[in-house]
């Protein structure tokens, strides 16, 4: 993403700061098991149907899916809350998860890194998808600033 930013002839000081945080917490991050995660879980991207009286769910629009730390799924769920306050999301996830989220110090660090990662995605994405005259540009400006601030607050 930092290379994408450079190709747009821009520089991301907050992205570089995030990379330094990743280096600082690499021992914590290396312990995370990987699985398919989705940074774009919100109601328009979820399809539900009933089969034999049971609700089945499907995700659509997976352009922000990747193989990585499962804690990233929580970034967009109840997104303005810190991990420990995402009671509904944690309860639903933990009810079906093989490995529940316990909101440990390490999980909070991993969550903060993922918030910063989404901030970096939004920061860089605006250079390729929008101009300053588009609503999306300004949404990404403010949203990425919020994600970075929250991330760096959790990575002190």
What are these regions (language model features)?
Residues 1-39, 49-51:
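An alpha-helical support segment within catalytic cores of ATP-dependent transferases
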Residues 6-7, 13, 122-156:
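ATP/Mg2+ or Mg2+-diphosphate-binding catalytic cores
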Residues 11-15, 98-110:
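Short, surface-exposed acidic
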Residues 36, 58-61:
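Pre-DFG segment of protein kinase catalytic domains
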Residues 44-48:
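Hydrophobic residue at the +6 position relative to the catalytic HRD Asp in the kinase catalytic loop
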Residues 67:
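Conserved active-site beta-strand element of glycosyltransferases/polysaccharide synthases
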Residues 71-102, 115-133, 143-145:
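Active-site activation/catalytic loop segments of kinase-like enzymes and analogous catalytic loops
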């Amino acid at each position: 993403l930092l290379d994408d930013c450079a190709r747009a002839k821009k520089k991301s000081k907050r992205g570089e700061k995030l990379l330094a945080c990743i280096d600082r917490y690499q021992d914590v991050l290396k312990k995370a098991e990987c699985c398919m995660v989705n940074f774009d879980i919100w109601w328009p991207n979820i399809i539900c149907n009933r089969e034999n009286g049971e609700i089945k769910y499907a995700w659509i629009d997976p352009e922000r899916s990747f193989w990585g730390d499962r804690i990233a799924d929580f970034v967009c769920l109840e997104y303005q809350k810190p991990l420990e306050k995402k009671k509904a999301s944690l309860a639903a996830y933990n009810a079906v998860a093989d490995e529940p989220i316990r909101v440990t110090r390490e999980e909070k660090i991993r969550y903060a890194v993922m918030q910063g990662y989404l901030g970096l995605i939004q920061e860089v994405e605006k250079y390729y998808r929008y101009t300053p005259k588009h609503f999306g540009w300004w949404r990404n400006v403010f949203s990425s600033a919020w994600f970075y601030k929250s991330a760096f607050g959790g990575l002190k």
